[in-house]
Each structure stands twice: as C-alpha cells, then as structure tokens.
Amino acid sequence: MPKKVITDHSTGERKCRCFKRCGGCQLSESYSEQLARKQEKAARMLSGFGKVEDIVPMEVPYNYRCKVQTVFATDSSKRIISGVYQSNARKMVAVDDCMLEAEVASPIVQTIKVLMKDMRIRPYDLRTGEGLLRHTLIRTSFSTGQVMVVLVTASSMLPAKNNFVKALVKAHPEITTIVHNICPNGMPLTLGERSVVLYGKGYIEDELCGCRFRISPASFYQVNPIQTEKLYSFAVEAAGIRKGVKVIDAYCGTGTIGIICAKNGAEVTGVELNKSACRDAKVNAELNGLDNISFFNDDAGKFMQAMASRGDSFDVLVMDPPRAGASREFIGCAVKLAPEKIVYVSCSIETLERDLRIFKKEGYRATFIQPVDMFPHTMGIENVVCLEKFEKPADKAPEKVTVQEKQVFLKPRGRSVRKPVKNGTRRRK
C-alpha cells in the first residue's frame, strides 16, 4: 500500500504528497510557522476590540479528525481505489493514508476495499449513476475508543451484508457499531434519511469536559475533540458559570456547551433550529442526568425576539453560530435582552470581526479574546470572545451603520447599497 505521508524524523514534521491536489490541508509550512501566521491574522483582525491572547496550539497536530469520509472509485485497471474529492470539485484524489484523519480509519478503509472486491460491490459513479457504495463514514471517540462505520449506498440492497459485517468486525474488533445508510440521490458525501443498524447500537459515545455525548451517524459534533475540550473550557470559564446562573445556549447543536454549563450548576436553555440535532441534545441531557437544562427546536433569532417581547431576562448568552455568523436581528434581540455577558464561540474570524463591531456599537466590549488552533494545517481559527455590558454615554447619539457593513449583510441576498451623496442630494443623469 503506497504511503502518502512523509515524516521528517529530525523534526517530527510530516508532509503530504497530495497537498497540491487534495485540498484537505491548506498550509504546508512547519507547525510553528502555521501558528505564527494564525496569530498574526487574529491580532490583525481582532486587536481593535481588545487584547488577543496567544493562540492555543495542539500538542500533536496530526490524526485529529474523529470524523472521516472516504469515497471509492475504480482506476483505469479496474482496481478499486479510495480517497477524497478534490477541493471544490467532484474529481476524486486517491489517498491511502491521511495525516489529519484518526489513525484507526485508514486500515478499516483498506479492508473495506478488499471486501468490496471479494463480494463484488461496485463503487458508485457520480457521472453515470451506476454502482452501489457511495462513500463510508467512520466516526471515532478518542476518549472511549468506540468506532462507528457507516456504509452509504445508493440502494437498500447490500449484497452479502452479513458476511461483509462479520469479516469487517473480525479484521477490526475495535469497531463497536456498523450502520447501513441508504442515499439513493443527493450531493456527494451526504447521508440519506433511512439507516439500518447492522451491528452494535447504531451510535458511539464520547466524553468531553466531564460530560458524555451520544454520536449517531448524522450528529453535529466537532471533528477535533482534543482542541474542542480546550475551546469549551475557555468558554465556560469566560462565562463565569456557577450555580444558579441563567444561560441561553443559542445555536446549541447537540447541546455540548450548554450541557457542560449545566453540569457546572447553571440553569440552561438551549435553542437549535435543526430537529435532529435538538433531539440529540435532549438525549445527551438525559445521558448526563441533568434536569437543569431544556432545549427548544426553534430559530435562535425568533426565540430571542419572543423572549424580549415577554420581558424575560438571563445572565449569560452563549452563542456558537454557523460560519455565516449571527444575523442582524439576532444581535438586536441579544442587545435588547441585555445579558451581563455574551460568550461568542466562532469558527469564522471574518464574520466574528463583523459581529463584534456591531456589539461594540451597542455597548458591549470584549474582555477576553482567545484563539484556538482547532484545525492544524488549514487556515481555520476558532475563537472564544467574552463580551461584557458597558453603559453607553447618555449624550452620545447612536452611530449609523456604514455602507460597508450594510454590504456585508445585503450582499448574500444580491442587493446593492448606494453610497451616500453629500448634502443629501443625488445628481440626475
């Protein structure tokens, strides 16, 4: 089996031969240089709001991805190959060993290729729509050692599935569950609505910050649990969580941050729009024996708006929005509710900067800014920012939204914003 990763034994640094073709890694310099690059970017974009702490590195910046998706194809010799889709394309890049993926994944994938050949299971071809196995999903818990394998097929028929499962588990006894997901159509690397458990319980469990979480095939869960534990610890500490503190966990996903807050004594309300994730959050709360946390399947902005109209109050808002950041409406409702602290967990430094600018104008100041290197060898930077309420001077008129800020919010909808004209007039053509 050809290796795709080269290790410099003098430094311990690894290099990937697929770097230019794959797209999984975006940075190829040494890890110390990567950290310096990310620190400079964080300081450049966020230092206007407060002191930016030193980025938190990963002790061993390899094999950190606990979620691994692999696609299959046949080469010119009709040999089954495995790999990933090229960045921003549907062309597959053959990869036998990835330095970012959990070490347990690659040997399992190699065995699956052998079984596909032996049992005449053809890889699915996106161009022709022929074949069966679309891709595999392998999820691993670094804390419990549990491993889930999901076989995603274009049809409900899986030839010799009992023999397939028996052979796979025999070769890899570390596998604790195998799930067959049926996805007859849809985009690459997506899951279908129907799943059948072939072996084990159909889920695995992971531990994070002293709490236990159930992970099913479609669960929302951070792909680097080692750094996630650090990230969430910073968030909980910044929030000043203690017994009796009222917390809103907006964009809560499967409830990870909120459950950790509740475990530390807070009274937590979680809000999540995705039904499946909200359902998982409730299961996770029960798994940890918590009765001081509740979850609502709702849009975070609308939920906050309803709270504001009722005159509700709480102490801390924890928000972990998607890459697009928070909506203007959400921020407006958050400010109206006026919590003492807002803890913003961000996966996009660009939208974080935009949102912090708005919070600042509304009387919130950053008291803590902590970047975390969640995804080594990529450009991604996660940040935890703690905002605290400061009274705005009574005689200060509210600042107007700039044209540039309007463009940030309106551009995705295809609307344009004209620049203001001096003296309030516009020349006719």
Spans of features found by a protein language model:
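A short catalytic or substrate-binding loop motif that flags glycine-/basic-rich loops and adjacent residues
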Residues: 60-65, 74-76, 128-130, 198, ...
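Short helix/loop segment immediately N-terminal to the Walker
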Residues: 123-130, 247
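Nucleotide donor/acceptor-binding cores
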Residues: 66, 145-147, 244-245
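Extended interfacial segments that mediate partner engagement and assembly in macromolecular machines
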Residues: 9-12, 20-123, 138, 142-143, ...
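Rossmann-like S-adenosyl-L-methionine
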Residues: 2-9, 160-162, 166-429
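Short, acidic/hydrophobic/Gly-rich beta-strand patch recurrent on exposed beta strands
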Residues: 83-86, 150-152, 281
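Short, aliphatic-rich beta-strand segments
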Residues: 138, 145-154, 212-216, 316
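Polybasic, low-complexity RNA-engagement segments
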Residues: 24, 90-99, 144, 153, ...
